Amino acid sequence: LFPSESNQYPYPQSLTGTIFTRSLITGSKYRHNLKDSALTTGNNSYIYYNDKGLPIQTRKPYMEGSSGRQTIITNQYSFSGKLLQQVVYHGKSYTTLTNKYSYDHNGRLIQQTSKAKDQPEKIISENTYNTLGQLKSKNLGDGLELQTYEYTIRGWLASVNGDYVA
């Protein structure tokens, strides 16, 4: 009846993994030599997927040669498969970075925010679109930079920040 993009299910999908990962990369192992010794160590990386084949979690070594330290990236998606939230956790430094993404009714990115540890949430970018769905302006940071986009009558990108040149 309705395309999946118009189904704006308000709640994110659960982080349920799947065992049906045929033709998907689920892990890797690589070896590297340490500079100060003749010993060779190896590191493993793992990727977990949901039932739609989207990566819900990635685990990889925090640094080369660091034993037990991992970077864990966890993704949460909407019903239509758009990335809603990404949480990045870095090893033993206990650094957590949370990125959130907001979309309009057509599935276009309208806002991206980021939060580090106990800091307040900051706006990374805000996008506005014209009536044809083309990117009209992009506000980066909390008003640090505003990029404006202009298009030709055919819909081709004519200029970015054209006012600065004139």
Which positions does each model-derived feature cover?
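Beta-strand elements of repeat-based all-beta scaffolds
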Residues: 1-166
